[in-house]
Swiss-Prot record:
Family: Belongs to the glycosyltransferase 22 family. PIGB subfamily.
Top EC class, one word: transferase
Annotated region (Disordered), positions in chain: 1-44, 492-512
Designated name of the protein: GPI mannosyltransferase 3
């Protein structure tokens, strides 16, 4: 927080405080100045804000380009799939979910990524990029755009914290945290709004009546303009006038369709939501909430009121959402910036003494800080690169196979009927929305289908109670489902892939709804592998690819590796040869490791230790022995008994030959 003018005049050697936002300048210009707080060292760069923004953009770009995992289906099916439809047309294979068919979503969000797709496709055509490079550009484009939005959200979160705690306080630097997962755009837009709404509340509190009227008028004009633009855009997207927020409330509250996707306990957000959202910051957030609501913050009145507003919203929003039976952590994700601001002050108070002094009293706090940092880094790395990575990698494999066997070498396909061209077929026997769709498949000639999970729209209460979607029917009895819902059942499975079949005998697969055609590639989780081996024994399907997906999963149907079976015997043999070669390499590395252990144990150590000490009254056998054989000690030719193992000297673990075979 800024120091008072009197204290600055009494010490002329203090540097002037750096400039901040216009709202902060207005508050500092008032005669009421905040009390001194812990100050950061003066910055040598006068334009700190621009440097911070550039750093956040760079960090977010690296974050976006290194993400290799799957977070939530909505980051693809509620944004990128509708955007693909806007940019390339319906016949290019986007999966449009039921929410869009019933006008439950606004098209403003997908419109951003539709523009990105259009620009990326134009760049690819202008530069003459290969299909592989074009696909990578189309996949990376939305992530780069979202990274910039997230960076701006982080920047304005920092600006709000700087306004509350002061330009040079530690708290303003403790609020921006790493978020490894993909973020919905409306969450970041709310981060931007947090600053505007909070500063507007301060202006409303301090201003005269005329200025309040001006602020209210501008808020009304801006809100009405956004609502009008959203309504017009939805009119062009859906083809008729509609109001998605009202229909969203009707379907999810009046018809209770949200409960179809799961019911949660009333305390979900308190017992699971906040812990999953905040992880290691949870204790500091709880302290910040308690202090803010229990005792008045030691800040200026206006700044303290902002913290009270943030704390109230952070409690009121989960309480309101708890009324709805279906709950998810991402519903309270927009609260994360506010929660970080509230946790900043307790975090600084706890760790700053341990970092600014060398007192041994704070060793435990230093160790705690190191643990929290490493815990966050470990979580970020695992969730960004490993957990649920197989469902992304498998689509890269499918695209590679399409490059080999499909028609990706065609420079451009007409949007009217891409299905008339050849390609490869893929079926996903997974819970619905387990993988991204056309945003990662890219090529329209990759003909794919997957199990659906449409809710019971328009059914009676009795019909809703007995309703089972397609994915549920499959997992209830996989063998019977394949018999009843696949073309030809289990007795007429193709022997050859479609790309090796003459065009006259090819049949175009039906997307998304049964009956499904038997595809060239079957994709499923390893949990289902024993069932499919039994159901498809004797068929031409065999394993041709496998990759790690997750070490654990809360959904038992999604556990294990992602496995791909295919009809191409050459690919099956190549994969088996590759697996055998990998096993040989692993065995050779293990054997080399054992040999090195033998050589190291057989070579006498040059370092002196107690085991090499020999009493003048004893003699060791000089004959050669195996490295793992226990050495004997004798006295005048008689073997001495082993010394007892005293507990206070510590029990030394003896190495055996068996231990050499383990890493």
């Amino acid at each position: 927080m800024p120091m008072s003018a009197r204290s600055r005049r009494s010490n002329p050697r203090l540097p002037p405080s750096p400039s901040s936002s216009s709202s902060s300048d207005a508050v500092r210009a008032s005669p009421h100045s905040s009390p001194p707080s812990r100050l950061r060292p003066p910055s040598a760069n006068p334009d700190v804000s621009s440097n911070i923004l550039l750093f956040l953009i760079g960090f977010r770009l690296v974050n976006a380009l290194t993400v290799r995992t799957f977070f939530q289906p909505d980051e693809f099916f509620q944004s990128l799939e509708p955007a693909w439809k806007i940019a390339f047309g319906t016949n290019q294979g986007p999966w449009i979910t039921w929410e869009w068919e019933h006008q439950l979503r606004s098209s403003l969000h997908p419109l951003i990524f539709a523009a990105v797709y259009t620009v990326a496709d134009l760049v690819a055509r202008t530069l003459g990029l290969t299909p592989t490079s074009r696909a990578e550009l189309l996949i990376a484009g939305p992530g780069i755009t979202q990274a910039v939005i997230a960076a701006v959200g982080d920047f304005y979160t920092w600006k709000l914290a700087r306004y509350i705690y002061g330009d040079r306080s530690h708290e303003s630097w403790a609020t921006v945290r790493i978020r490894s997962n993909a973020i919905e755009a409306d969450a970041d837009q709310l981060q931007l709004a947090l600053t505007v709404v909070s500063l507007a509340s301060v202006a409303l509190y301090r201003s005269a009546w005329g200025e309040r009227q001006t602020l209210a008028r501008e808020a009304l004009i801006c809100g009405s303009s956004v609502l009008a633009v959203s309504t017009v855009v939805d009119r062009f997207f859906y083809g008729f006038w509609t109001f998605p927020p009202l229909r969203f409330l009707y379907f999810n509250v009046a018809q209770s369709l949200a409960a179809f996707y799961g019911r949660n306990d009333w305390s979900y957000y308190a017992s699971q939501g906040y812990p999953l959202l905040l992880t290691t910051a949870l204790p500091f957030t709880l302290v910040g909430l308690y202090r803010t609501l229990k005792t008045p913050p030691k800040l200026e009145k206006q700044k303290g009121s902002i913290l009270v507003q943030l704390a109230s919203i952070s409690l009121a929003m989960p309480a309101t959402l708890s009324v709805i039976t279906h709950k998810e952590v991402r519903f309270i994700y927009p609260l994360l910036p506010a929660l970080h601001i509230l946790s900043a002050s307790p975090l600084v108070e706890f760790f700053i003494p341990a970092l600014t002094t060398t007192n041994r009293e704070y060793i435990s706090r230093r160790l705690t800080l190191i643990f929290l940092l490493w815990a966050n880094v470990a979580i970020a790395i695992y969730t960004t690169l490993f957990h649920a990575s197989g469902v992304i990698s498998v689509l890269s494999y499918i695209r590679e196979q399409h490059q080999i066997h499909g028609t990706a070498n065609i420079p451009s396909l007409p949007k009217e009927s891409p299905a008339s061209y050849g390609g490869i077929t893929t079926g996903f026997l997974m819970p619905c929305h387990s993988t991204p769709w056309r945003s990662h498949l890219v090529e329209p000639t990759i003909h794919a289908w997957a199990l659906s999970c449409e809710p019971p729209v328009g059914l009676t209460a009795e019909e809703k109670a007995a309703y089972r979607d397609e994915a549920d029917q499959f997992y209830d009895n996989p063998t019977q489902f394949l018999q009843d819902n696949m073309v030809g059942g289990l007795r007429h499975i193709p022997r050859r892939p479609s790309y090796a079949t003459p065009p006259s005998s090819q049949r175009q697969p039906t997307q998304l709804f049964p009956p499904h055609e038997w595809p060239d590639y079957l994709v499923f989780f390893a949990q289902l592998e024993p069932t499919l081996k039994d159901a498809l024994r004797g068929s031409s399907y065999g394993e041709c690819w496998r990759t790690f997906n997750s070490a654990w999963h809360d959904d038992s149907r999604r556990r294990g590796d992602v496995v791909v079976w295919c009809l191409d015997h050459a690919k099956q043999q190549a994969w088996q040869s590759q697996k055998h070669q990998r096993e040989l390499e692993d065995r050779d590395r293990q054997f080399d490791h054992i040999i090195k252990r033998f050589q190291r144990d057989a070579t006498p150590s040059k370092s002196w230790h107690w085991s090499h000490w020999t009493s003048p009254f004893s003699s060791q056998s000089k004959s050669w022995s195996w490295p793992w054989e226990r050495k004997k000690r004798t006295l005048f030719g008689y073997e001495l008994p082993d010394l007892p193992q005293w507990g206070w000297f510590g029990k030394r673990k003896k190495k055996t030959l068996l231990s050499d075979f383990w890493f």
